[in-house]
Amino acid sequence: MKALQTLMSGESLTQDQTREFFQRLIKGELNDIQVSAALIAMKMRGETPAELAGAAEAILSAAKPFLRSDTTVIDSCGTGGDGSNTINISTTAALVAASMGLAVAKHGNRSVSSRSGSADVLEALKLRVNLDPSDASTQLADNGFCFLFAPHYHPGIKHAMPVRQTLKTRTLFNLIGPLVNPARPDAQLLGVYSEEWVRPMAETLQRLGVKRAMVVHGSGLDELALHGPTRVIELRNGELNDYHVTPNDFGVPSAPLDELKGGDADFNARILEDILAGGGSPAQRHSVAMNVAALLYLSGQYNDMKAATAATMEHLDTGQPLLHLRRVQDAQETYHV
C-alpha cells in the first residue's frame, strides 16, 4: 500500500492520500497491523494539518447524516486528555449558551482522562446521549441544544479500537473528535490538551472550511483558563490570528486551578445544575462565563469579551439556564426510544 510506504519512509501524506487511507480504515478494509503502523508513523513524526483534515473528511463523509437548519450552529468541544479532572466547563458553557439563544450542537464522547466526560455528565443529568439523528435535529431546532454522541454517528471508528486499546498511547484519534462533528458547525471553540496542537488544529479547521473558530490551550487545560494565560489562534475570514488572553481580558479575577476540581459524573452534574441555577463558586461561574463569552463572540453577538462575560454573569443570576435545561430534559420524552 503506497500510503503506508510513504509513512514508513518518514514522509507525510497529502490530504487526499489521508482521506483515502481513512476511508478504507472505516470500511474495515485494513488489518490491525496496517492501522497500527500508520497511526504510529504519523504520531512519531507529528500529525500534519493535511493529515488531520484528510482523516476528518473521511470520517465525516461516512457519518450518519444530521439535518440542520440554516441558522448558525456552534460547538464547544475539547480534545480532552489534559489530565486536569476539572468540572465539565465546556458542557456547562454549551448549555448556558443555548439558553442565551445560540444553537449549540455539542459533539462528544465519554471520559478520556477525567472521571467525567461530556456524555457521562449529560447522562447523569438524565439526558439521552444517543438520540436518533432526526430527534437530535429537532432538539437543536426547538431548544438550541443537542448532543451528538461520537460513537453513534461514526460507527466505522470501531475498526481502529483494538489497535487503540492495545497501543494505549495518544494517536490521531485523540485529536480528531472536535473535527468530525456531524452537524458541521459554522463556528467552534476548540480546546486542545497541549499547546503544541493549537496551530496545527487551527490550520486543520482552516482546511476544512470552518468559518470562525478559536483554538485554545489554557495553561495546561483544553479550555480558556482562569488560573493563567490562554494561547489562542482565532480563525476568521480564512485568516489566522495568534494571541494570548488572560482572565482580565474577560473582566474576571484569576483563581487557582484546584477551585475548578471535579469528581465523578454525578458530582459534576450537581455542580453544573448549581451553576445553571445561579449558584456555584465565583471561580466556577467565572470559568463558565469566560467560555460562554467566547461562544457569543464567535457567533457574532458580541465583539467585546468583557461585555459578553458580563452579560453571561447577569444571565446566570436569573436562573434561566436551569429552566432551559429542564425544557431540554422534558422535550426528550417525546422522542423515539
UniProtKB/Swiss-Prot annotation:
Family according to the record: Belongs to the anthranilate phosphoribosyltransferase family.
Chain sites annotated for binding Mg(2+) 1: S90, E223
Record GO terms (molecular function): anthranilate phosphoribosyltransferase activity; magnesium ion binding
Binding site for 5-phospho-alpha-D-ribose 1-diphosphate: 78, 81-82, 86, 88-91, 106-114, 118
GO biological process, one term: L-tryptophan biosynthetic process
UniProt cross-references to SUPFAM superfamilies, sorted A to Z: Nucleoside phosphorylase/phosphoribosyltransferase catalytic domain, Nucleoside phosphorylase/phosphoribosyltransferase N-terminal domain
Transmembrane segments: none
Organism: Idiomarina loihiensis (strain ATCC BAA-735 / DSM 15497 / L2-TR)
Pfam families, A to Z: Glycos_trans_3N, Glycos_transf_3
Disulfide bridge partners, by residue number: none
Cellular component GO terms, alphabetical: cytosol
Protein name: Anthranilate phosphoribosyltransferase
